[in-house]
Amino acid sequence: MKHRISTMVLLGGTLAALSFSSLPAQDAPNPKAAQKLARALEGRTPGKPVACIANLRGSAKMSVVDDWTILFRDGGTIYVQKPKGGCPKLSRGQYALVKRQVGGSQYCEGDIGEVVDPVSGFFAGNCVFGPFVPYRKVG
């Protein structure tokens, strides 16, 4: 019985280690993404995070830094969005971020964005929005 329990514990620990090792490394963005984000936010300071922003239409208003960071521009403010768990495949450039909404004209924390192929309409993944951090120019 002791052997069986220790085998189960070992197996469970191994499975947990394997599942955690396959998670993307959110804390270590690639250098190109870090440089792109730094350039976009140069001369700006972060404000207090907000739960919702206006639903900005048009590709010029949204830019993807990587699967972990999306920028939304509204006038002189850039909102940094870090989806909880990332937004798989979004940074590949061939996919679009679509938010299915019923009424309302905002992106809000907790909303689910879908990553889709705009040509075929096939679903490629999804992401859950976190808070939006506004960055404004200093002075």
Feature-to-residue mapping (PLM):
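Bacterial N-terminal signal peptides that target proteins for export
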Residues: 1-10
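Bacterial N-terminal signal peptides
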Residues: 9-19
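N-terminal secretory signal peptides
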Residues: 23-78
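Disulfide-bonded cysteine motifs in exported proteins
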Residues: 47, 81-82, 103, 122
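A short macromolecule-binding patch
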Residues: 78-86
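Helix-rich interaction surfaces within compact, conserved domain-sized segments
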Residues: 88-139
